[in-house]
């Protein structure tokens, strides 16, 4: 998400410091220590300004939600929402998704949300798409077997590509829809989703059941090199 730089970013970040995890790698394998009574650990990749994040945490007080966002200008808005709602079960981290396995232990996550990621439409950038099989490999290592990935996008070509990737990895896909809100609002919407739904743009959604699968070593190596470049 691209946003204008905020002149008062640092003071605002400081006021929300209780919601930010500065060294997430230190919690690898022990994220539940942040909320010992939680029944599940959910992770949202790319939370943006946090509408979905805050409302999901509020609706599921027994769940620990970790929200990932690389744009600090967006993250601070999301953290302020959590603070203003006095939420106790959500925390935020700045993390490159390519480093998932450095932050979360195998099978530590119960559910992963991928909402409206960058579609990277050019074919040469396909490996940057968050539903590329190399990323799916990382998700299925950190999400427990039988856990789920919930994926939403307004981009039809990305959704079609993603379904092909899920199938190529042998992953079960369920509750597939190409027009989620056709008969009325379903579930919690992101801010981005609200805007596009209001314009009549169909929202694609599906759920993927995680399980281990084998990714060719050469493909995994190439993708990791691409992310580091």
Segments from the language model and where they lie:
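S-adenosyl-L-methionine
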Residues: 1-41, 51-58, 80-106
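Conserved beta-strand signature within the Rossmann-like core of class I S-adenosyl-L-methionine
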Residues: 146-153
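Conserved SAM/SAH-binding beta-strand->alpha-helix loop
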Residues: 71
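Short alpha-helix immediately C-terminal to the canonical SAM-binding loop
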Residues: 75-76, 159
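A short glycine-rich, Lys/Arg-flanked "PGG" loop and its adjoining helix->strand segment in the class I
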Residues: 131-145
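Class I SAM-dependent methyltransferase "Motif I" SAM/SAH-binding loop
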Residues: 46-48
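Class I S-adenosyl-L-methionine
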Residues: 162-164, 169-229
